[in-house]
Amino acid sequence: QIHRNNAFYGFLIQVCRLIYESSALDESGNNYKFRDFTRDHQKLARLFESFVFNFYKREQSRFQVSSPRFPWPFKSEIDEHNSLLPAMLTDIVLEDENRIVIIDTKFYSNTLSKRSDFGTTSFKSPNLYQIFAYMQHIPNPSRKDVEGILLYPDVGNSINARYNWKDQNVTFKTIDLDQKWTAIKNELLMLVDLIHSEAA
């Protein structure tokens, strides 16, 4: 069972599961072939989410790291209708005595959407709706500062954009996973202000 003290192994288990699920017997039935899983974006998305979650579990101690589930605030007078509402399930939440940082990981071959009629690009609307809903409805009885981060692998268009609304920040960030580990580590720590750029 994965728990706080061995959370890093959760990522390794995900890697092993990916290898297992991407293996198939060849025609002889005696050997395994490894399928090209890089075309399976759902598996890559789960692997990326697991990596980021376990990174913050392992590489820092300021924040508590979790993936909380919480309900929508809507209520029906009919109990059975309340059970029809889906829960909000976050990817990664970092929380200390002052801040709640909600990180939603995404994995796309194209980070931005392109409008064919105007030829303009923009962030994907469902991503923004999702992180905004999390920020508005996550339980926060102590009224901590809440911020949201949409984190993407860099697929050729580096992005680091921060927006503000009513003292809440939303950041869109890509990270290059093809760089040295120290650079990846520093970027992820800087993302939540655990180190500053001078230390990178």
Over which residues does each language-model region extend?
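Residue(s) in the substrate-gating loop at a strand-loop-helix junction
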Residues: Q1-R39
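Catalytic core segments in nucleotide and nucleic-acid processing enzymes
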Residues: H41-A200
